[in-house]
């Protein structure tokens, strides 16, 4: 069983990240989906190789923009989402996931938290944790075998 924390769109709000510090340390994997990718720099040494990051549209020309990670038989496709026009529709994102053979998609960019399933693919957007945003949130996931269970947690400052 793997415990995964997914964050996105922190936009410089280090307080939000540190408000879940213990949860980050206790997790097996931490994904930051961009828009202020560098917000995780201070924790990168502490989290080590359990930290996975992709760059967002506010991270200006950096790579990687997407990654594919296998966890207990599940393929997780992680991206910020801007490359796929997710503010209009998730269709292109879902097609990319299918092309990659992904079972799970983590994405951000919209600042709107959601968990849903489309064509057998679990789609998770943790929402945003930006300083001036409303409804700050992150996602907490548990992978057991080839099954993922996810919740949106709004207990973030």
Locate the predicted segments by residue:
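Short acidic, glycine/proline-enriched helix-loop-strand junctions
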Residues: 49-50, 115-130
């Amino acid at each position: 069983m793997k415990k995964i924390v997914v964050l996105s769109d922190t936009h410089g709000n280090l307080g939000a990240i540190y408000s879940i510090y213990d949860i980050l340390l206790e997790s097996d994997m931490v994904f930051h989906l961009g828009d202020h990718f560098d917000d995780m720099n201070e924790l990168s040494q502490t989290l080590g190789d359990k930290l996975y990051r992709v760059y967002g549209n506010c991270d200006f020309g950096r790579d990687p923009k997407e990654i594919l990670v296998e966890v207990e038989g599940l393929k997780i496709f992680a991206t910020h989402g801007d490359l796929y026009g997710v503010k209009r529709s998730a269709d292109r994102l879902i097609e990319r996931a299918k092309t990659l053979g992904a079972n799970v998609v983590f994405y951000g960019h919209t600042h709107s938290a959601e968990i849903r399933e489309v064509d057998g693919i679990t789609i998770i957007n943790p929402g945003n944790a930006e300083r001036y945003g409303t409804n700050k949130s992150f996602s907490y996931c548990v992978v057991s075998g080839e099954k993922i269970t996810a919740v949106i947690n709004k207990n973030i400052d």
